[in-house]
Amino acid sequence: MLTLVLGGAASGKSEYAESLVLRTTGPRYYLATMQVWDAECAARVEKHRKMRAAKQFETMECPLHLDNVRLPARGTALLEDLGNLAANELYDPAGAGENAAKAILHGLESLAAQCENLIVVSNEVFSGGADYAGDTGRYLLALAQVNNAFAARADAVVRVVCGIPVYYKGVEK
């Protein structure tokens, strides 16, 4: 099953996505896309890693090249999040650059083929308007392209607002 969980900053989307994973059986993979730039980032990553360990997640770092990820066994994968991955692929010199959306979608297809459930967390884009230029505009367009394409293929699309899940496609399981 493919699920897209969208929401604004601090909307509760990540917590909701984790709750979906905790309803499943079998291996649980947390695919972390945040790049570690400094000690503060490293501390944040370690804190989150410890929190997920109690929930029986195996954490896999994948800030770039999602199509290179190989899951050890079928199970449920939680990708956190498309916003970081899009920025990394667009702007990291080792990333896909202008082909970021295409590379991410290819990676999502690869992941979907490897697991029973793929739950993807992403940021809501363009709800504050669509008049952005330069790097910001390119980033938002790439993320919107990935969101739209994955939503079309997903079994469930849910937006989390103030911690409340609202289903646009599929039903809560």
Regions found by a protein language model. Give the residues of each.
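Generic beta-sheet signal
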Residues: 3-5, 28, 75-84, 118-120
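Conserved P-loop
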Residues: 2-72
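Short, hinge-like loop/turn segments at secondary-structure boundaries
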Residues: 47-49, 77, 137-139
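Helix-adjacent hinge/juxtasegments
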Residues: 55-100
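Short, functional N-terminal and low-complexity linear motifs
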Residues: 12-18, 76-77, 110-118
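Short, glycine/serine-rich, charged loops/turns that create anion-binding
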Residues: 10, 35, 83, 125-126
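Residue-level signal for inorganic ion chemistry
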Residues: 17, 48, 78, 123, ...
